[in-house]
Amino acid sequence: MRGSDQKILLMVMVVVAVVAAAQGQEETTGFVTWGNNYYQTWGHQALVINKTSELQLTLDKNSGSGFESQLIYGSGYFNVRIKAPQTTSTGVITSFYLISRSSRHDELCFQILGKNGPPYLLNTNMYLYGEGGKDQRFRLWFDPTKDYHSYSFLWNPNQLVFYVDDTPIRVYSKNPDVYYPSVQTMFLMGSVQNGSIIDPKQMPYIAKFQASKIEGCKTEFMGIDKCTDPKFWWNRKQLSSKEKTLYLNARKTYLDYDYCSDRQRYPKVPQECGSYT
């Protein structure tokens, strides 16, 4: 190959590499279908219906089931719509996670706790660098078995927000004195499983997940630090005055348990509790 041809080839390779890196910084926007971003990880074969816009997970006497995303993220807004299993579902847990792959992992989690009728409880939990036990539980103001409802995470360099149907119910703000999830990439995961003894007469239990809206910073070709760029709208996102009102009302009206107030479990208030707004 002539020297001039080698130079041209090298330039082409550089351009391709730059384009690939730039694509790594592109946000994933809009509704992401199950076939495009998710795959089953355990349990029964998931049933994809409604032209890839809906996924069913099954729990029976043999096993539950779960899925996770193919893509990993460094920040973003992550939403899924869930219809929990039928009314009589004591012991059944339907979950949606944002989680990292590490022995000292970070994790955000929604868990719809099955019961034999309303009011149903929604447990939220966090793991910060492998340390869990940070439960906050809410009485849902609707029946999650009757229709689909939205469950969302906002994750940016300044705060983590848990949303239910556009109502913020839990906010964790960055605090220089405590650990904040900003060094580990995370992926999405969902499951239905038994948390205790369940009624075999009610099996199978079927949890339905509708196509999610993902607006996140993908990290295939770059480090997580690039995902803090304010060019991404979610990194500039703060609670609006309306959201603050909804948040305070949800905490006042529907909060059922807060680990930060549990002196039997934690005689000393956990350090990160000062980071909740």
UniProtKB/Swiss-Prot annotation:
BP GO annotations: cell wall biogenesis; cell wall organization; xyloglucan metabolic process
Protein name: Probable xyloglucan endotransglucosylase/hydrolase protein 11
Coiled coil spans: none
PTM annotation, UniProt: Contains at least one intrachain disulfide bond essential for its enzymatic activity.
Biological role: May catalyze xyloglucan endohydrolysis (XEH) and/or endotransglycosylation (XET). Cleaves and religates xyloglucan polymers, an essential constituent of the primary cell wall, and thereby participates in cell wall construction of growing tissues.
Catalytic activity: breaks a beta-(1->4) bond in the backbone of a xyloglucan and transfers the xyloglucanyl segment on to O-4 of the non-reducing terminal glucose residue of an acceptor, which can be a xyloglucan or an oligosaccharide of xyloglucan
GO molecular function annotation: hydrolase activity, hydrolyzing O-glycosyl compounds; polysaccharide binding; xyloglucan:xyloglucosyl transferase activity
Carbohydrate-modified residues: 50, 194
Keyword terms of this UniProt record: Apoplast, Cell wall, Cell wall biogenesis/degradation, Disulfide bond, Glycoprotein, Glycosidase, Hydrolase, Secreted, Signal, Transferase
Location of the active site: 107
Gene expressing this chain: XTH11
Enzyme class: transferase
Signal peptide residues on this chain, from the entry's feature table: 1-24
Disulfide bonds: 217-227, 260-273
Pfam families xrefs: Glyco_hydro_16, XET_C
EC number annotated for this UniProt entry: 2.4.1.207
Record family assignment: Belongs to the glycosyl hydrolase 16 family. XTH group 1 subfamily.
CC terms in the record's Gene Ontology section: apoplast
Highest classification ranks of the organism: Eukaryota, Viridiplantae, Streptophyta, Embryophyta, Tracheophyta
Location(s), subcellular: Secreted, Cell wall; Secreted, Extracellular space, Apoplast
Domain GH16: 32-209
Residues engaged in binding xyloglucan: 123-125, 133-135, 265
InterPro entries in the record: Beta-glucanase/XTH (IPR044791), Beta_glucanase (IPR008264), ConA-like_dom_sf (IPR013320), GH16 (IPR000757), XET_C (IPR010713), XTH (IPR016455)
